[in-house]
Amino acid sequence: MKSVPLISGGLSLFLSACSGGGGSFDVDDVSNPSSSKPRYQDDTSNQRKKSNLEKLSIPSLGGGMKLVAQNLRGREPSLLNEDGYIIFSSLSKIEDDFKKENQSQEPTIGSIDEPSETNSPQNHHGQQYVYSGLYYIQSWRNFSNGKFYSGYYGYAYYFGKQTATTLPVNGEATYKGTWSFITATERGKNYSLFSNSSGQGYSRRSAISEDIDLENDQNNGETGLISQFSADFGTKKLKGELFYTKRKTNNQNYEKKKLYDIDANIYSNRFRGKVKPTEKDSEEHPFTREGTLEGGFYGPNGEELGGKFLAGDKKVFGVFSAKETEETKQKTLPKETLIDGKLTTFSTKKPDATTSTTANAKTDATTNAENFTTKDISSFGEADYLLIDNYPVPLLPETENSGDFATSKHYEVRDKTYKVEACCKNLSYVKFGMYYEDNKKNNKNETEQYHQFLLGLRTASSKIPTTGNVKYRGSWFGYISDGETSYSTTGDKRQDKNAVAEFDVNFAEKTLKGSLKRADSQNPVFSIEANFKNGGNAFTGTATAKDLVIDGKNSQTKNTPINITTKVNGAFYGPNASELGGYFTYNGKNPTDKNSPTASSPSNSEKARAAVVFGAKKQVETNNK
């Protein structure tokens, strides 16, 4: 999308891209050396250092690891490792792999249904938002490179469909569910706990839960493998336990026996921590080493959780999932929206009048209904990763030494190449930007469809300041069209070359006023007025642009001025409302009856279109005046 001149108030304006944000700025005429008005700079007191995550700890909707088999022509163990962990954007990846490997059409064991309210609860313990388990075949062989493998083929996996956006701000929630595991292999090594495997589990192939003589009769107690969790949302701590159940027989009593404790920290709607074995010196099983654990909360209100872990000795990989207990459901834990994931989709493609058929008309109607609209998407709160087609893509800054204020990078997702433009380096709790499918050969978006995003971890309502007037300064991405000509903003590595967003927030009156400006002259393009009088952490209001002219030929009388008045939505992010962000669209429809003959404000322009996303950081006065 190439920028063209924009005319406002009789002046020819050229808008560039994303914003300014760090550094200092004057609130009056900086050319006046005697100015005594204050200067401002970013408040860095609540800056968050981006987590340096290994592959296993990168947040995603789900993932898994393949079962392994022992090379029967050698003695070297087949260990599990982090490189073998696969991030899943869809369970179809497992399905496609099985079509290739299961050529003898062996019957599969387990299920890879994606989470749904209508799926059979027997297979997934009644869970709706995240599943975990095994999916495998019991007969598989491979001869390659002088090696011979024989065993099971399949995956241990977990997968969720909807990340949590609303969570308790205090209090404790308990969850109960299941877990599954796979092990490494070592030739000739056997463990007594895997008594159901006829000597195969661990010595020739990955041992799995079915190799344990588990209780299967509910009359004797709980059955199978059990996971239990307690999440304290006040202290941001997650505790858990992983059990197996020893089957009651004539020779042994029923027993629910713990193998692991879980100790993790909660980060927005994800958690990271450790699994800790309860029997470090056991010779009966391989569950003896501490491991790395990561997972998250799923369902709109965090009704379920799921995740995975890998033992430090690379001998055990586990997956787990659980749902709220009835005890938690009966509690009245204070909950509010804390995680934002917003996606605005718009197309710059003009209709082709020469191919107007009934079928095309229906397609155009569907496209127009979705065009310049915003929807909720799954996100991970910390705003370090964006999901594109359900696959996590890292956002800036990617390294501590990166000097880029905004970034533009290509990523491969499901055989497609996307260009992702993200802003801004100085924002810790909210990120925004745009992505689109890109042809790397000609650096062109041939689909002419674009996606603006906003991700963030909101400030808890109780932590929103109640007094004071605060300035915020940041950046914005935008697209504006008058129906014939358009202009768009794009990011720049240099902070001083980005378009500016400025806001004044009165926390006592719960009002916000802002302006989205050009990068060069600082003249306003959109003005924003909003309030957060409902006492929450979000604001709503109106974004207005008046008498704008987009002129591709730079002649101030060529195109008709446009007027836009539309609803703006946003929120405060980070500790003590240290950042803010928001978005708005305009698709030719008026939020109120601005087109009536008696309307006092200028009529909205029916053919105009706009999509805007912005973010800003709290400012503090500098000592330099």
UniProtKB/Swiss-Prot annotation:
Region of interest called Disordered, as start-end residue ranges on this chain: 25-52, 99-125, 275-298, 584-610
Highest taxon above the source species: Bacteria
Covalent lipid adducts (S-diacylglycerol cysteine), residues: 18
Signal peptide span: 1-17
Compositional bias segments (type: Polar residues): 587-605
Pfam family, one: TbpB_A
InterPro entries in UniProt: OMP/PagP_b-brl, TbpB_B_D, TbpB_C-lobe, TbpB_C-lobe_sf, TbpB_N-lobe
SUPFAM superfamilies xref list: OMPA-like
Location within or outside the cell: Cell outer membrane; Cell surface
Biased composition (Basic and acidic residues): 276-292
Sequence similarity: Belongs to the TbpB family.
Function, as annotated: Haemophilus acquires iron by extracting it from serum transferrin (TF) in its human host. Acts as a transferrin receptor and is required for transferrin utilization.
Protein name, as recorded: Transferrin-binding protein B
Lineage of source species: Bacteria, Pseudomonadati, Pseudomonadota, Gammaproteobacteria, Pasteurellales
Gene name for this UniProt entry: tbpB
